[in-house]
């Protein structure tokens, strides 16, 4: 009799549909640790699935955003999504435990008062209301994700349009020959065509579809970004200094999105650096996991109370005393891109001492990394 479990616990079968970068966020780390290590009253079985490797799960469970947590057993099935999965789960666990106790006694819940105040019908209505709230939160998350995608693509359109305009002006002034002009125009039109495709896909696809991480030479991407902005700094007394080691390892990142981050940070640095100022671009790899990129300027700096806000959506700081427009949606786009790659971005700044923006990118680890094809969706924790 000693080997018999007198109180066998019901199995709680959960499916977490999330990408690898989701699992590095604080909320999901806490969720997984809780389910694996804490006693929540159930025999927990947690399966973690990558939606890129198993896209059929999205249709099977009617998931519109990731990450999502699906309760498979005991029935009925429930889906938790949005930015508060862990909190939602903890709110439901006591209810499931109550259902387990009643079921274990061979009883069924009748439409009578259960606790002296609420009937079973009232509990059912409460459950339905919670489900509706979850679905509403999921839809809101999806709409917000699409809005951020639109802002990202619209912001990125500025670069090829500006470059094409400058090329036309330079050709009219005789500063570049017709062959150079055609080459620049052709490349910029190709970029605009790709961005137009992105815009068409925003309403029908998820965030991850706009990213394609691969083995990437970040040094070359940085050189191209500096060359692309040369028209902005050649006519000014501004020095651009680069410090990139020759043995810098390749990274695992999307080429277009890394270029977008570098262009945005360099453009901001040029905007805020006065004549006679210095801009520095440095890259280093202190660990075997990350390449760290820093872009610093000698501008007016950013007030300490604004240094976190500038990375948020819908935040634009006031104009500086020099008349430059405030930081806009570009930095929030940079944050999203960096986080989607599993990294983080931050700024160190003091008034009148310039600003230094730093972000990290994962180092290329070999063919196995590419086969895993990191799930690039939304939901990273705030840096």
Curated annotation (Swiss-Prot):
Record keywords: ATP-binding, Biological rhythms, Kinase, Nucleotide-binding, Phosphoprotein, Transferase, Two-component regulatory system
Domain Histidine kinase span(s) in chain numbering: 152-365
GO BP of this protein: circadian rhythm
Keyword match Kinase: yes
EC category name: transferase
Xref: InterPro entries: HATPase_C_sf, His_kinase_dom, HisK_dim/P_dom, HisK_dim/P_sf, KaiB_domain, Kinase_SasA, Sig_transdc_His_kin-like_C, Thioredoxin-like_sf
Family annotation (Gene3D superfamilies): 1.10.287.130, Glutaredoxin, Histidine kinase-like ATPase, C-terminal domain
Presence of keyword Kinase: yes
Recorded catalytic activity of this chain's protein: ATP + protein L-histidine = ADP + protein N-phospho-L-histidine
Cysteines engaged in disulfide bonds, as pairs: none
GO molecular function, one term: phosphorelay sensor kinase activity
Listed EC numbers: 2.7.13.3
Positions bearing Phosphohistidine: 155
Cited function: Member of the two-component regulatory system SasA/RpaA involved in genome-wide circadian gene expression. One of several clock output pathways. Participates in the Kai clock protein complex, the main circadian regulator in cyanobacteria, via its interaction with KaiC. KaiC enhances the autophosphorylation activity of SasA, which then transfers its phosphate group to RpaA to activate it. In addition to its output function, recruits fold-shifted KaiB (KaiB(fs)) to KaiC to cooperatively form the KaiB(6):KaiC(6) complex (independent of SasA kinase activity).
Entry note about domains: The N-terminus interacts with KaiC, while the C-terminal histidine kinase domain autophosphorylates and is probably responsible for self-oligomerization. The N-terminal domain stimulates the C-terminus to autophosphorylate.
Subunit (UniProt): Homooligomerizes. Interacts with KaiC. Participates in the KaiABC clock complex, whose core is composed of a KaiC homohexamer, 6 KaiB and up to 6 KaiA dimers. SasA and KaiB(fs) compete to bind to KaiC.
Name assigned to this protein: Adaptive-response sensory kinase SasA
Origin species: Synechococcus sp. (strain CC9311)
